[in-house]
């Protein structure tokens, strides 16, 4: 009898343990199905350039029959708002075609280039990593059709002339002063000529114009709301400076990178106050006469 009791107790304990094990397994399985793996910390870093073909800052590039430019990154990337973010300096009649390939982008130039000219492809924040969309700010690809790269720099600030607030994302146009010989031409410069160099202000209104020549420029700022590289009176804000400015003759300025806002900051050398005008043309006094009754006898 004692032996039978011991066996019964053992069987009961075994059954209890089995039931408890099944309950715990079901509970853990339910919990596991409700939780998802964290996958580690969120990726907050932009793509890193690992190769450019041809090399950045290359010279003596052909005027026609351009080879494709390939820019490779350390991860897969995406293009966002490239029509709005991307621009060239100077402007090209046919905008380059940008496509994705592997872990990089391909840029196909489609325009005949000018001789002995430095070109800059400015991508803004169009290039982003494929997973989190982290932008690679202010990436530039620079080359020259001549033996040298123009290397002069000017900094400036664009502000609303009425509110004194900064004007972000406005384009800065640089025209060689020797192409504008008189006041009348100066007034119509942005209608008659194409800028020799282009820069764009950051969100804080600061701009840094790079790869300029060591010559005197006339400087204009245009908001360009339609992203067509054309000034449209009554729609776009515009600003201009009366004098001419040679980057070689300007004082040095400090420049640093704001890691929080993620753009370059500089002490401005030029200040452009922008306004909206239906007819951007100054009135010029062409003749001065006194009425006959007020003339001296």
Question: Which residues does each predicted region cover?
Answer:
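Acidic, low-complexity Ser/Thr/Gly/Pro-rich repeat segments typical of extracellular/periplasmic
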Residues: 30-211, 216-220, 234, 238, ...
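Acidic carboxylate motifs that coordinate Ca2+ or other divalent cations, activating on Asp/Glu
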Residues: 228
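Long, low-complexity intrinsically disordered regulatory regions
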Residues: 253-261, 267
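Bacterial Sec-dependent N-terminal signal peptides
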Residues: 1-46
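Extracellular interaction modules
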Residues: 250
């Amino acid at each position: 009898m004692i032996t039978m009791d011991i066996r019964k107790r053992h069987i009961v304990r075994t059954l209890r343990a089995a039931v408890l094990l099944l309950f715990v397994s079901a509970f853990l399985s339910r919990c596991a199905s409700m939780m998802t793996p964290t996958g580690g910390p969120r990726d907050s870093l932009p793509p890193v350039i690992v190769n450019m073909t041809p090399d950045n800052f290359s010279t003596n590039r052909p005027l026609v029959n351009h080879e494709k430019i390939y820019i490779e990154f350390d991860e897969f990337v995406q293009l966002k708002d490239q029509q709005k973010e991307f621009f060239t300096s100077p402007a090209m009649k046919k905008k380059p075609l940008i496509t994705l390939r592997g872990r990089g982008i391909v840029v196909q130039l489609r325009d005949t280039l000018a001789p002995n000219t430095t070109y800059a492809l400015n991508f803004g924040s169009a290039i982003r990593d494929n997973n989190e969309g982290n932008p690679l700010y202010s990436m530039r690809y620079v080359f020259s059709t001549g033996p040298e790269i123009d290397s002069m720099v000017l900094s400036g600030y664009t502000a609303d002339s009425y509110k004194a607030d900064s004007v972000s994302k406005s384009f800065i146009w640089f025209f060689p002063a020797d192409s504008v010989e008189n006041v009348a031409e100066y007034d119509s410069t942005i209608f008659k000529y194409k800028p020799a160099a282009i820069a764009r202000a950051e969100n804080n209104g600061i701009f840094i114009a790079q790869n300029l020549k060591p010559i005197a420029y006339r400087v204009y700022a245009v908001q360009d709301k339609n992203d067509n590289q054309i000034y449209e009176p009554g729609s776009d804000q515009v600003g201009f400076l009366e004098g001419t400015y040679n980057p070689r003759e300007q004082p040095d300025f400090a420049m640093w990178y704001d890691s929080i806002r993620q753009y370059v900051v500089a002490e401005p050398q030029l200040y452009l106050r922008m306004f909206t005008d239906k007819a951007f043309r100054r009135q010029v006094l062409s003749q001065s006469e006194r009425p006959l009754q007020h003339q001296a006898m």
